[in-house]
Amino acid sequence: MSDIIKLKHVRKEYDDGFVALKDINLTIESGKFYSLLGPSGSGKTTILRIIAGFSEPTSGQVFFDGQDITNLDAAKRKINTVFQNYALFPHMNVFENVAFGLQIKKKDKQEIKLAVKEALHMVQLDGFANREISELSGGQQQRVAIARAIVNQPKVLLLDESLSALDKRLRKDMQFELREIQKKLGITFIFVTHDQEEALAMSDEIFVLNEGKIQQSGSPVDIYDEPVNDFVARFIGDSNILSGRMIKDYEVEFGNHRFECADAGIKPGEKVEVVLRPEDLDITDIEHGKLRVVVESQLFLGDHFEIKAIDSDENEWLIHSTNPTKIGKEVGVYFDPEDIHVMRFGESEAEFDKRLEAYEGEE
């Protein structure tokens, strides 16, 4: 796939001295679904606004299809945006809202009619053309906003927290619908969210941001299974994170025990952090466990039990299990070497990738 958007050394500093973006470099390929994921204030919406042309970077460049568009007016970019509040016109019906952009461009009436019909069909709103906006549910308004954006046939569609106003069930339904729409259209979607589940469910690739910097980028599986630092490990899903020490390649120490692991390329004796996901931990009898813990609490969450336990060194453990246990019981905890992920302190994403390639190449 060809590159459609590139940001090179983009920095955004406001008049009050606040730096929203710090040397952002990213590449967006054509035809993929991307998520910009991070907490409030991480810089994700600022990146979206700079791509859209609603905000100019203090320094750096923005490229679209190989052309420098850093100073190009937003209206001249082949990019459309779906805003958090949908920004629909309440005095217009569904057809008029979707047709608005085409009418501004003075397109032929019959061409507009056919384009609007096709866009509404794409978002499963056949027969809604004459409905008033006030008659629509939140999910239907979301679809109208998407139809209004895609009717202009943009090369890139930007979505700014566009599912956040929906209830949980509808939000999940719209995740599937957005992904299907993106696949049918074959255009690039860039989705801004603070919701990890949304990003993991929909994206081909994710950029994880914090404090104006890209912490890690990659596929949902790579980011979940191989977080590059403490922030990513804690922000993407639940984690057990413990202090440890690398013994040698493929062996790490934590909790006063040594364990076989799948990591290498770290100096013997180097202090590290160890990540174990709750769903990778199995409760077993003490004899077969690699660790001993005492169960402190247990919650039933529908598809699993969330169990909190503590070991003899006062380390707290979070375990997701499909089977219940008993509070106060001492149990064994089992995990495979591949379930252990070792993180170096201060290691950048580039350094992590280089180390990963080196030791995977030796296998």
UniProtKB/Swiss-Prot annotation:
NCBIfam families according to UniProt: potA (TIGR01187)
Alphabetized PANTHER family for the sequence: SPERMIDINE/PUTRESCINE IMPORT ATP-BINDING PROTEIN POTA, SPERMIDINE_PUTRESCINE IMPORT ATP-BINDING PROTEIN POTA
EC number: 7.6.2.11
Domain of life: Bacteria
Residues covered by the ABC transporter domain: 5-236
Record-linked Pfam families: ABC_tran, TOBE_2
Similarity-based family: Belongs to the ABC transporter superfamily. Spermidine/putrescine importer (TC 3.A.1.11.1) family.
InterPro entries associated with the record: AAA+_ATPase, ABC_SmlMolc_Importer, ABC_transporter-like_ATP-bd, ABC_transporter-like_CS, Mo/tungstate-bd_C_term_dom, P-loop_NTPase, PotA-like, PotA_ATP-bd
Cellular-component GO terms for this entry: ATP-binding cassette (ABC) transporter complex
Gene: potA
Subcellular location: Cell membrane
Organism: Lactobacillus johnsonii (strain CNCM I-12250 / La1 / NCC 533)
UniProt-annotated binding residues for ATP: 38-45
Protein name: Spermidine/putrescine import ATP-binding protein PotA
Complex formation: The complex is composed of two ATP-binding proteins (PotA), two transmembrane proteins (PotB and PotC) and a solute-binding protein (PotD).
Function: Part of the ABC transporter complex PotABCD involved in spermidine/putrescine import. Responsible for energy coupling to the transport system.
Membrane topology: Peripheral membrane protein
